Each structure stands twice: as structure tokens, then as C-alpha cells.
Curated annotation (Swiss-Prot):
It comes from Shewanella sp. (strain MR-7). The keyword Transferase applies. This is tRNA U34 carboxymethyltransferase. It catalyses: carboxy-S-adenosyl-L-methionine + 5-hydroxyuridine(34) in tRNA = 5-carboxymethoxyuridine(34) in tRNA + S-adenosyl-L-homocysteine + H(+). One of its GO terms (molecular function) is transferase activity, transferring alkyl or aryl (other than methyl) groups. One of its GO terms (biological process) is tRNA wobble uridine modification. Homotetramer. Its EC number is 2.5.1.-. PANTHER family: METHYLTRANSFERASE, TRNA U34 CARBOXYMETHYLTRANSFERASE. It comes from the Bacteria.
Length: 330
């Protein structure tokens, strides 16, 4: 069974220690709820990942664990077969002992767009909300973060993350907890909070922004990346049914509207640092994710529109700073 005890030990003498009052019970309940289904099967695969400590790791320019020179061809083939049991791999890519996990998303492209604009992560405590399998968490560690905590309720993402962590050979200060942000108390403790690709999945975007604010220390930095549309501060797309075949997309604001929401939630120094239309080469079907991807979500006759006729995915990155809260919003 996946254990969170090392995380509890690491935060026992940190500014996250009061989280221990509720966190073990919440994670214990999550484990009980998932003791049937796929999680036990994936945990058995994790228990087979017994490999030597890697001869090289790189989290600065990629997520690379081992060169592959330590493994025989047979060992490498066995490892690849084990890692394929965690398919589909959506966020990456990862390079594990010479095995290239070519994920659906080129998450490294997003990191290259976002990272030049954020405050340096050196010695920062970081929260990544909706972290997926943890690709960006490793890049945050590579950028010098003191501790990185990711939250995502998916059992598969947790097991993909655990596979990379176990193969990395060290107990790195990077932890994925299978939680949604609504399960976090107001911690007021993180120096930087990332929410990338989450806001449009929330039924109440304002509540999500307030939840993000509650995790930041005063003066902490929010890095928010989400779908946007063109328009003024009153422009918000509410898809009638599906958006890009997704039935869980609720609100897609303009950049101006999103900045207004952040201001209303008592963020300051709000600035848009990047906008980018998602390219077909950034999100695509691969050997490690053989299901439908972006090209199937767009109008085959006009890729500037989704298959439903809405504007094709365009993403913006907004950076803001936590200010003294307005009591009317809390």
C-alpha cells in the first residue's frame, strides 16, 4: 500500500504541521474507498519496480531518471512493460532508464512558457493543484523548490507519480496527495501555488480562486493557467453541453474577466504573462496514450473551432499576489 508517512514526518516541524490534525484521516478514508478497483492492481506493479539507483537524474531541463546504461536489454524491456501497465500517460514526457515515455501532452512546452515569468522557486514551499502525474512538480524541484506538494484525486496519476519517484532512487521532497482542493483546510503556508488546467473544470471559479488564496501565505504568488476566450471583462463562455468533447467544462472567461475575478478575490499585482493557442503537436495521440486527443476534439474542417463550434483551446497564464483578504469574501 502506498504510504504517506514520510510526508507526515517531513512536515511535522514545518509551517504545514497543523495539516496533520486532519490529513491522515482524510487520506486513510481515500485508501479505504479505493481498496477495490484498479488501485491494488497498480500497487502490485509498483512493488515490482526494484531497480538500482539511477546513475543520473535531471529535473532542471527535463524529467530524466537514469541513462539506461545500468540495465541489460532484458531488464529495460521488463521495466518498459511494467510502466506501460500505467497507461494512458497524459502529462510528461519522462525519460526513465533510457525509456522515453511519450505522453499525450508536451508538458515541458507549458513549463517553458510559464517558468520565465514566475518568482524564483529557490527554497520555496510549493503547491501544485491538479498536478496530474507530477511532471511539473519535478521541474519545480529542479528549479530549486524546498518542498513540492501536489494534489490530484486520481489513483492512476498517484501511481504514475510513485513509479517515477521510486525509480529516482531518493526520497526527494516531492509528494503527491490524492486530494481535491476542497479537502484542504486554509493552510496560509505556501510561497507559490500553481493551478494549471483546473479552473474551467470547476463549477464555481470564484470559489476555486478563494481556495487557492487560502493556501498562500501573505505575499505568496499564484500561477494560474487556464482556458480563455477573446473579449472584454464581461466575456465568459459557458458551454451549453460539451467543449472539446469534455462534459466538465463550466466557465471559460476572457483574460480581462479573469483578471477582474482575481482582483475581486483580493489578489494584487495581477498580470497576464502568456497566451497560447494549443497546437496539435502539443496535445496528441502517442504510443503511450493511444486514445482520442486534440485533433479529434476540433472541427475537421476548421481547427480554429472545437467540434461543437466553440473557439479552439486558447490558454493564458496569469500571475498574481495574495493580498490582505476582504472579510466579505471569507
Amino acid at each position: 500500500m502506498i504510504s504517506f508517512s514520510s510526508f507526515y514526518q517531513q512536515i511535522a516541524d514545518s509551517n504545514l504541521q497543523h495539516w496533520l490534525e486532519t490529513l491522515p484521516a482524510i487520506l486513510g478514508r481515500w485508501q479505504r474507498e479505493h481498496k477495490h478497483g484498479n488501485l491494488p492492481k497498480w500497487e502490485k506493479v509498483l512493488n515490482k519496480l526494484h531497480y538500482p539507483a539511477p546513475d543520473q537524474v535531471d529535473f532542471v531541463s527535463s524529467v530524466t531518471v537514469g541513462t539506461g546504461e545500468q540495465l541489460t536489454p532484458g531488464e529495460k524491456e521488463k521495466l518498459e512493460n511494467l510502466l506501460r501497465l500505467f497507461m494512458p500517460w497524459r502529462k510528461g514526457p519522462f525519460h526513465i532508464h533510457g525509456i522515453h515515455i511519450d505522453t499525450e501532452w508536451r508538458s515541458d512546452w507549458k513549463w517553458d512558457r510559464v517558468s520565465p515569468h514566475i518568482s524564483p522557486l529557490q527554497n520555496r514551499t510549493v503547491l501544485d493543484v491538479g498536478c496530474g502525474s507530477g511532471y511539473h512538480m519535478w521541474r519545480m524541484l529542479g528549479a530549486g523548490a524546498k518542498r513540492v506538494v501536489g494534489i490530484d484525486p486520481s489513483p492512476l496519476f498517484l501511481c504514475q507519480f510513485e513509479a517515477v519517484k521510486r525509480l529516482s532512487g531518493e526520497n526527494h521532497p516531492v509528494h503527491l496527495l490524492p486530494l481535491g482542493i476542497e479537502e484542504l483546510p486554509p493552510l496560509d503556508a505556501f510561497d507559490t501555488v500553481f493551478s494549471m488546467g483546473v479552473l474551467y473544470h470547476r463549477r464555481s471559479p470564484i470559489d476555486h480562486l478563494l481556495q487557492l488564496r487560502d493556501q498562500l501565505r501573505m505575499g505568496g504568488e499564484l500561477v494560474l493557467e487556464t482556458l480563455v476566450i477573446d473579449g472584454d471583462e464581461n466575456a465568459v463562455l459557458v458551454p451549453q453541453d460539451r467543449y472539446g468533447k469534455m462534459n466538465n467544462v463550466w466557465f471559460i472567461p476572457s483574460v480581462a474577466a479573469l483578471m477582474l475575478w482575481l482582483k475581486k478575490c483580493d489578489f494584487t499585482d495581477i498580470r497576464c504573462v502568456d497566451t497560447d493557442v494549443t497546437a496539435l503537436a502539443e496535445q496528441r495521440r502517442t504510443d503511450w496514450m493511444p486514445n482520442e486527443s486534440l485533433v479529434e476534439y476540433l472541427d475537421p474542417n476548421d481547427i480554429t473551432k472545437t467540434i461543437e463550434g466553440y473557439p479552439a483551446p486558447k490558454r493564458a497564464t496569469i500571475i498574481a499576489v495574495k493580498n490582505q483578504p476582504n472579510q466579505d469574501l471569507t
